[in-house]
Regions:
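N-terminal presequence-like segments and the immediate start of the first folded domain
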Residues: 1-265, 270-288
């Protein structure tokens, strides 16, 4: 569950959510993420993933704070973590390191690790000022945990790293989805279309991951942009060109995973400015 809004709207949204959810609120807060005011005003959007099942998910806590849920269905079990962050350290890289350690601790608590994770979402305030540092931290952990490196099977989760910071003031936060049961059920796509493996230019994530979710086989497509094979931005200064290239890159991933536009269940677009948002809306409305 995620809420995207201007900082000034966060408390209003928190209160509204509490009133609407009532006894459905199990104490696990959504990821409140700070975005600039866009065409829709102070509130950019709310994203909720829900599963209809016979029972309520089990609440997971870290250091006494509810931060996720476990869903169990016959033969399957899933862990979702929300808004994992750290504010005990001052430097962004130190916060990222503590954040990754917290997520790993939660996974270990239930007999899993990052090899069980098909998808992560990384929320990074002022991303351009420290993205290289973040990548070094993440890569270090993934090597330590055996996701990448000699003898590994390149098991990097699909991921989004976006320049939206958590509303609690931390430099970063993360969400993740893990498959606790069945084990070793995730496939990873490293290279597709015009995009080579992101790890070649220092970003440790897969282009997509396929795994078993409650409703069946699911493909998670990573955050995708107008990037060439070497990781450089293309169509600089041309919003329409970047948007069309991004859509082309996403479709290449879908095709590689034997999917099409008709198989897409959910998508979210992050636009840097309202000007870009206007261009995106004009292109989106014309998509077949």
């Amino acid at each position: 569950e995620r809420v995207f809004s201007a900082r000034s709207a966060v408390e209003t949204l928190r209160t509204a959510r509490s009133g609407v959810y009532g006894d459905l609120d199990d104490g696990v807060a959504p990821s409140f993420l700070v975005a600039s005011e866009g065409l829709s005003g102070l509130i950019a959007g709310v994203q909720v993933h829900a599963v209809s099942s016979g029972g309520r998910p089990q609440v997971v806590d870290l250091d006494g704070v509810p931060c996720g849920r476990i869903l169990r269905v016959p033969g399957r079990a899933y862990l979702a973590l929300s808004g994992v962050s750290d504010q005990q350290h001052e430097q962004p890289a130190d916060q990222a390191r503590a954040m990754m350690q917290k997520a790993e601790a939660a996974l270990r608590k239930f007999g899993a690790d990052f090899l069980s994770v098909p998808r992560t979402w990384m929320w990074l305030k002022d991303i351009l000022s420290w993205y290289d540092d973040f990548n070094q931290v993440r890569t270090g952990f993934f090597k330590e945990w055996g996701l990448i490196g000699a003898g590994s099977r390149q098991s990097m989760p699909a991921s989004t790293g976006i320049g939206l910071g958590p509303a609690n003031g931390a430099h970063c936060a993360m969400d993740l989805m893990a498959v606790l049961e069945p084990t070793e059920c995730t496939q990873y796509l490293q290279t597709t279309g015009k995009q080579h493996c992101a790890f070649e230019y220092g970003s440790a994530f897969s282009r997509a991951a396929r795994s078993i979710m409650p409703a069946g086989e699911t493909v998670f497509v990573s955050g995708t942009a107008s990037i060439d094979a070497g990781g450089a931005t293309t169509h600089v200064g041309d919003a329409a060109g970047q948007i069309n290239a991004t859509i082309e890159n996403v479709r290449a991933v879908l095709s590689e995973m034997q999917c099409s536009d008709d198989d897409v269940v959910q998508v979210i677009a992050y636009c840097k400015t309202t000007a870009v948002e206007k261009v995106f809306n004009s292109i989106k409305d014309k998509l077949a």
